[in-house]
A protein has these predicted regions:
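Catalytic nucleophile-loop/oxyanion-hole region of alpha/beta-hydrolase
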Residues: 63-94
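Conserved alpha/beta-hydrolase "acid-adjacent" motif
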Residues: 224-230
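Gly/Ala-rich beta-loop-alpha elbow adjacent to hydrolase catalytic centers
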Residues: 97-101, 105
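Alpha/beta-hydrolase-fold enzymes
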Residues: 100, 111-187
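Catalytic active-site module of serine/aspartate enzymes centered on a nucleophile-bearing elbow/loop
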Residues: 241-281
């Protein structure tokens, strides 16, 4: 719980920014941390009409044993609790996320029909098919079905770690290798965790046509983890109106990479277009310079 009585998950990594009437719930990625959404949360809060909530998913910001002890329904249950509390405080609530968090935002909308004002989907991850992914990765779903298959699979984060900004990439690499999981996330991901992602994605894909809320889908054409196929799939199958925008000069982690200001600008505009509350346009050129460290407050 934070000072506002909102459940932000385990530990102290989750945060709330802003004090506006529109609520925005952002969900971090698999093996990730709330920190990867801090820059976007700060930018949206500066718009003046938003309060942004970023919880920690169950099993995250610890070690792999913590993560393996949880499944996708545990991750969702924490998000559900936060969403219910945020909805009690705000007439309009937008939900979004990065990577797996974008997929989970769709699940939230499907579980709470008529209660989500819109979706903010960053680098949606329905399958790992980016240019840095091993070409045999397509076999992973098959291995997940073989007895003990999940126990022989292990995936390690490798350069460029979803980040084109070389300075930031070096900082993230150091933090991951030094075990600073609450800042940069985990360096490895076990097969059990990957299986949970596949299970959640299968459920969400079936529900997508029934999700009628408007969605902003942002994806990099240079994404090293998940190709634009993922954004195209959302555009084709989501039941509501989709605004898909492809970014250049960044990799998978678009919320912290070289185009994060563009992500803020597009997100703020989308929220303003789909809310009953209006505010002055956010000045994304003001404030902090390009993110120098994932510890940026």
């Amino acid at each position: 719980m934070n000072a506002q009585g909102i459940d932000l998950g385990e530990g102290t990594a989750g945060f709330v920014l802003g004090d506006g009437p529109v609520g925005i719930l952002l969900i971090h990625g698999l093996t990730g941390t709330p920190t990867e959404l801090r820059q976007v949360a700060k930018g949206l809060a500066k718009a003046g009409n938003c309060t942004v909530y970023v919880p920690t998913l169950a099993g995250h910001c610890g070690d792999n044993s913590d993560l393996q002890a949880t499944g996708w329904q545990d991750w969702y249950e924490g998000v559900r609790k936060t969403f219910v509390q945020v909805k009690q405080r705000h007439a309009q609530v937008f939900v979004g996320g990065l990577s797996m968090g974008a997929v989970m935002s769709m699940y939230v909308a499907s579980e709470h029909p008529g209660q989500v004002a819109g979706l903010l989907m960053y680098s949606t991850t329905l399958k790992y098919d980016g240019w840095s992914i091993n070409k045999l990765a397509f076999l992973t779903p098959l291995l997940m079905k073989i007895p003990f298959g999940v126990h022989i699979c292990s995936f390690e984060e490798k350069p460029p770690y979803g980040i084109k900004n070389e300075r930031l990439r070096a900082i993230v690499e150091r933090q991951m290798k030094e075990g600073e999981s609450s800042e940069a996330g985990l360096l490895t991901m076990e097969g059990i965790t990957v299986r949970e992602l596949h299970r959640m994605n299968a459920v969400v894909k079936k529900r997508m046509p029934q999700i009628k809320v408007p969605a902003l889908v942002l994806h990099s054409i240079e994404d090293d983890i998940t190709s634009r196929w993922n954004a195209d799939y959302v555009e084709r199958h989501l039941g509501g109106p989709v605004t898909k925008i492809l970014l250049d000069n960044c990799y998978h982690m678009i919320t912290v990479d070289l185009q994060y200001r563009r992500v803020i600008e597009l997100s703020a505009r989308f929220v303003e277009q789909h809310t009953v509350f209006k505010s002055t346009r956010i000045n994304v050129g003001a404030g902090s310079p390009a993110m120098a460290s994932l510890r940026s407050a």
